[in-house]
Amino acid sequence: MLRTARFLQRSISATSRPNCIVQPQRTSATCPRSFILQHTEATSDPLTPEIRLRLLTPRCDFWRQKPELWPYGDPYWAIYWPGGQALSRFLLDNPQIVRGGRVLDLGCGCGAAAIAAWMGGASYVLANDIDPVAGEAFRLNCELNNMKPLDFQAENLIGRETGPWSLIVLGDMFYDAELADLLCDWLRRSIRSHGTKVLIGDPGRAQFSSHPVLRHLQPLAQYSLSDSTKEENYGLTDSTVWSFEP
């Protein structure tokens, strides 16, 4: 699994986040919940010590196993990506942004930002990811933080009619120009239709930094990444939270 974990980190760090289309599951026999409990570690990152997550770490057996032995699609949910770290820290430090509101964590992965939003007092939080295994990981992460599991939806919401969200958060999602264009159009419609606020977390990867969306972003906060996150993400040192204001 070391090769898989390193591949995922390298793909996001050097150029982009990997393709969001998860590989088909290789088996239906394994119970995701039991598998995640057995093959991940409950840990916390120095940037957000308030939140504990089940992640793939160097101490996990699959970190060094052959990737083909992994029974599910690529485990993007098992890594705490830098954009998500920055978003989570920002929400924890600024609970007034979520308090009493309806929050969508788009492409949630491990669900840290959704958990941070709930900790900040959001009235409703929906975590969304196209990988259903991410949903099981998210539920376990909620339990790990002594929370009743929040709602999770395993569908591609981009391009669909959005609900009246007060806040949409997304981290590490600007990894492909075509997807970024679709995201921007969809987020604009939500802002204009519902007055939704949009926060984006990204550590400054190439696709994000060169995309026209930067003209419509206002930086809100920048955070230094932990030494381990820097090492795993090939030279990225900081992660920024932006407000999307088209």
Curated annotation (Swiss-Prot):
Alphabetized UniProt keyword annotations: Cytoplasm, Methyltransferase, Mitochondrion, Transferase, Transit peptide
Domain of life: Eukaryota
InterPro entries, alphabetized: Ribosomal_L11_MeTrfase_PrmA, SAM-dependent_MTases_sf
Coiled coil: none
UniProt subcellular location: Cytoplasm; Mitochondrion matrix
GO cellular component terms listed in the entry, alphabetical order: mitochondrial matrix
Disulfide bonding pattern of the chain: none
Top EC class of this enzyme: transferase
GO terms under biological process: methylation; negative regulation of fatty acid beta-oxidation using acyl-CoA dehydrogenase
Protein name: Electron transfer flavoprotein beta subunit lysine methyltransferase
UniProt gene name: etfbkmt
